[in-house]
Amino acid sequence: MCTDTIPVLAYVKIELFFADICYYQRINPKPITDMAKKIAEQLIDTLAESGVERIYAVTGDSLNEVNEAVRKNNKIKWIHVRHEETGAYAAAAEAQLTGRSGCCAGSSGPGHVHLINGLYDAQRSGAPVIAIASTIPSREFGTEYFQETNTIKLFNDCSYYNEVATTPKQFPRMFQSAIQTAITRKGVAVVGLPGDLAKASAVSVDSSVRNYFTRPEVCPSEEDLILLADLLNSHERIT
């Protein structure tokens, strides 16, 4: 091989190498990190866009970032209650009275346990409620950390959606799923939010995070209506 062609071949290989990198980046785009916005702020923005106007909560250490995000956002009010149970009941009542999603929050440990009664009421009443269960730092999971609770086990029976956020990239789509579930199924959606994730930089995603405000209705068939009418008409005393 002529030595004059070696630099040319090396140049071609380098060009092909960078072309491969560019192609890979096009089909595997990196998420865009918004260094100016935290996950907690992204959470509050998403709630506001879905029509939530108030968060009923008791301030706690793991909820500090969410509390601060509410302060910066002028679309949502932080309603400080004396007990998380009261906050959960208030969120359920607001959802039933207004038709919009209610929202409550509780910090790790007692704050989670106190939400239970109100969330059961919302779930059984068909009230769309989003519960933010802020948790201990994710690096402390499974270490018997102070006031650690297993939110999946704790809220599983009183919710249609119950997951724990783990990464900034996952959070936007996950939170949208939680809100959409509460709206569509008219019940409780619980989102576990580790304290360290709440203060992490937010990430934009390519997939849609829009919520759709559907109003599903159950309509019995004509045959069932006729059967019910005949049953009622064939008896003199109906309770």
Regions found by a protein language model. Give the residues of each.
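Intrinsically disordered, low-complexity segments enriched in serine/proline and basic residues
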Residues: 3-11
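Low-complexity, intrinsically disordered or signal/transmembrane-proximal segments
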Residues: 11, 23-25
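N-terminal alpha/beta PP-like core and its mobile active-site loop of ThDP/TPP-dependent enzymes
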Residues: 34-239
